[in-house]
């Protein structure tokens, strides 16, 4: 099934953010599903993040969600799986979630609860469609 235009735009926002926080010489290692790069690998739980970066000291998983996607059971299971993957990584970890502005308050509350429930130290970055950043 093809991705919606909105989802593609949200993925691009996450990609741009990730490329800005990785070392300059490693930007080409940022993986995302496009003609320009290798598709991200499947991680625990058999999920494929929209954006992926890994080196010895840093793991970044990125996911874009539209208004219709965020509340779905599949999305919630993805987020838990991504945080489990981050919990098993020895180094700095980020989960970057890009979504429409109206979901930001809900997402912040959800991820605060989820981090506490999972005893997770991963930095969760929420980006709205304008690229505004919120950290949980």
What is the role of each PLM region?
Residues 32, 64-66, 99-102:
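Structural motif
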Residues 1-7, 20, 25-57:
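Active-site metal-binding core of divalent-cation-utilizing nuclease and nuclease-like domains
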Residues 38-43, 69-72, 102-105:
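Acidic-and-aromatic substrate-binding clefts and catalytic sites of carbohydrate-active enzymes
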Residues 96-136:
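Domain-level recognition of nuclease-like catalytic cores that cleave nucleotide substrates
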Residues 73-97, 103-114:
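Short, charged, amphipathic alpha-helix that recurs within catalytic cores of restriction-modification
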Residues 14-18:
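Short, non-transmembrane alpha-helical segments in secretory-pathway proteins
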């Amino acid at each position: 099934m093809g991705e919606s235009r909105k989802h593609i735009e949200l993925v691009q926002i996450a990609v741009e953010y990730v490329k800005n926080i990785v070392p300059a010489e490693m930007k080409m290692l940022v993986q995302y599903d496009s003609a320009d790069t290798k598709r991200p690998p499947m991680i625990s739980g058999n999920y494929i993040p929209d954006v992926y970066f890994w080196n010895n000291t840093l793991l970044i998983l990125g996911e874009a969600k539209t208004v219709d996607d965020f509340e779905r059971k599949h999305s919630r299971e993805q987020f838990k799986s991504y945080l489990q993957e981050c919990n098993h990584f020895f180094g700095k970890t980020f989960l970057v979630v890009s979504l429409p502005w109206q979901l930001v308050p809900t997402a912040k509350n959800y991820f605060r609860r989820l981090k506490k429930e999972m005893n997770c130290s991963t930095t969760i970055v929420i980006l709205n469609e304008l690229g505004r950043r919120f950290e949980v």
